[in-house]
Amino acid sequence: MDDAIAISRHDDCPEDAARIVDTGLGEANDAAAPLHEVRPISCFARLSSGEVIGGAVGRTWGACCELQQLWVSPSYRRRGLGARLVREFEAHAQARGCERFYLETFSFQSPSLYRSLGYVAAYEHAVYPHGIVKYVMVKPAPATTPRTSSP
């Protein structure tokens, strides 16, 4: 290793250095995989006034869909809106050809909601303080009834 190289430690993330790392990683990833095929996907719940009171945001790539964010305004929680948003999000992704879904969630977020919608924990990372667990959850798309041709 070159003796002229120094490694620095930080308790924050200097923007200029982080930008260099992000750009370099992006270039390496783009050279290795067709990431231009990754597409954003979302759905939102709005009041008649147009105010957004919830949303599901993610991305699709091939037959895979990642739900990255789910949020419902506190005054509209516990009414089934989160489940409706996830179902609409999944239906939209299935229309794109997605057959598999995944997400990451913490134990203080909504793992029980996702379980009720058919997600299972593929991995549990129980290393955080205060008993907090991070889950990686997966769900296959529902099987469709195969079309049969008429005789």
Feature names for model-found ranges:
Residues 1-13, 143-151:
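Conserved N-terminal entry element of GNAT/NAT acetyltransferase domains
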Residues 21, 114, 119:
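Conserved active-site tyrosine of GNAT-family acetyltransferases
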Residues 39-56, 84:
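Conserved beta-hairpin
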Residues 51-59, 64-71:
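Conserved beta-strand in the GNAT
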Residues 76, 80-88:
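Conserved acetyl-CoA pyrophosphate-binding loop and the N-cap/start of the following alpha-helix
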Residues 93-106:
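Conserved GNAT acetyl-CoA-binding A-motif
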Residues 102-104, 120-138:
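Conserved catalytic-core motifs of GNAT/GCN5-like acyltransferases
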